[in-house]
């Protein structure tokens, strides 16, 4: 990018957008800012429209180039846009996105936000709602025309770890936007990975050209497990919980460094390497050890499994020196450390599905990144003991837990909201 963050590298990556989807969804809930809500919705729509395979998995990238030129798919000229729009649409659009200024990318215009809606409304003597409507109509028209251009190449590898992040991002967006279809897309991606990338109790890392291959790495197990936990917060799914447990147990059995703590990048039965790598720092994606620790903490407290908490502690102890030396590079492990030292709130709702939907919707409006919420229908079967012990008592009830200690059941939504606001 340039110093002004105006011109991007035009390649679009699944892992970037999956993470941003979750971040904007959280920001929308935390702030109530309409812009964040809009970006969440538009990012989700883009993922579903441009990167989802017919079977429900998600492809890896859209290239930067088309027809041999970087960014050609995305740039415009004022004359092109003027020919496509009504006069009343063009003027606010041009001011908003710089078509009334000099070209900003190789003699053409990459659409960049230059002027606020409020300033445009003042300049054109219109109300802000009218300006927004006209700009939205213009964007829709340009998207329609852009889709008729020669598309950038698409890398149609489906990577397990990146799809795990996408499941998590879609689940968060589902909650923030109250759109169950996004949770449905996350479930479909889960089913795709289970059908195509899970064989004999182990994950495969890549699906491409109709085949799945390569033994999965730590990141695949950890990020998919994290995505499944996020999905459980958006929609009760017994299969998601059971698979998360399976993934974590494989991770503990085959990736653990039993001497120093933490997890190796490769399994103990992976092809022999001169050195088995074990990394703690974040890169373009979160560190596998950091994600694993966060999964172990949350799943451990949800299910009352102290061995998961112990494994998370061993990981944090193993990473301590690296975190202390360069904390900025270990954000994921720092988030895990925060939840290890101050356990997350685990909120278990029990009752009929329709009533649970109302309770969860209200609770989701109370932003708390350190709270995990699971709404378990009263007719759910074969529950783990820690969830089965939390009974549905006629109507909906809530169990508020911190660490391994839970409150008596909270019998009304109003009381629950009061208690959560007081935390």
Task: Kindly label every feature range from the protein language model.
Residues 1-423:
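Glycan-recognition and catalytic cores of secretory/periplasmic carbohydrate-active enzymes
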């Amino acid at each position: 990018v340039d110093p002004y963050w105006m011109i991007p590298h035009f390649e679009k990556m699944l892992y970037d957008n999956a993470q941003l989807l979750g971040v904007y969804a959280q920001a929308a809930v935390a702030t109530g800012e309409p812009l964040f809500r809009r970006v969440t919705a538009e990012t989700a729509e883009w993922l579903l429209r441009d990167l989802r395979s017919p079977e429900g998995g998600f492809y890896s990238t859209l290239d930067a180039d088309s027809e041999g030129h970087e960014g050609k798919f995305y740039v415009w000229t004022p004359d092109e846009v003027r020919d496509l729009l009504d006069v009343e649409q063009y003027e606010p659009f041009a001011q908003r996105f710089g078509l009334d200024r000099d070209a900003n990318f190789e003699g053409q215009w990459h659409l960049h936000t230059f002027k606020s809606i409020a300033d445009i409304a003042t300049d054109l003597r219109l109300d802000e709602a009218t300006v927004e409507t006209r700009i939205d109509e213009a964007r829709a028209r340009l998207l329609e025309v852009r889709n008729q251009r020669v598309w950038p190449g698409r890398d149609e590898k489906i990577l397990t770890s990146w799809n795990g992040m996408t499941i998590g991002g879609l689940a968060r967006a589902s909650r923030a936007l109250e759109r169950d279809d996004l949770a449905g897309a996350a479930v479909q991606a889960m089913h795709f990975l289970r059908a195509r990338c899970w064989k004999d109790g182990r994950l495969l890392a890549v699906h491409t050209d109709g085949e799945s291959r390569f033994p999965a790495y730590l990141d695949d197990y950890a990020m998919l497990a994290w995505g499944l936990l996020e999905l459980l917060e958006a929609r009760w799914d017994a299969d998601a919980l059971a698979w998360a447990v399976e993934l974590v147990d494989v991770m503990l059995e085959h990736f653990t460094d039993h001497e120093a703590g933490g997890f190796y990048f490769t399994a103990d039965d992976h092809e022999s390497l001169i050195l088995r790598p074990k990394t703690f720092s974040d890169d373009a994606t979160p560190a596998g050890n950091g994600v694993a620790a966060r999964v172990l903490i949350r799943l451990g407290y949800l299910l009352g499994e102290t061995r998961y908490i112990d494994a998370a502690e061993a990981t944090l102890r193993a990473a301590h020196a690296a975190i202390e030396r360069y904390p900025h590079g270990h954000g994921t492990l720092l988030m895990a450390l925060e939840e290890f030292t101050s356990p997350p709130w685990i909120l278990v709702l029990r009752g009929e599905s329709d009533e649970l939907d109302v309770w969860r919707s209200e609770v989701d409006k109370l932003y708390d990144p350190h709270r995990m919420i699971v709404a378990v229908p009263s007719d759910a079967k074969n529950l783990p003991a820690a969830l089965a012990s939390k009974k549905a008592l006629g109507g909906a009830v809530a169990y508020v837990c911190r660490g391994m200690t839970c409150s008596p059941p909270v019998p009304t939504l109003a009381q629950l909201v009061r208690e959560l606001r007081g935390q």
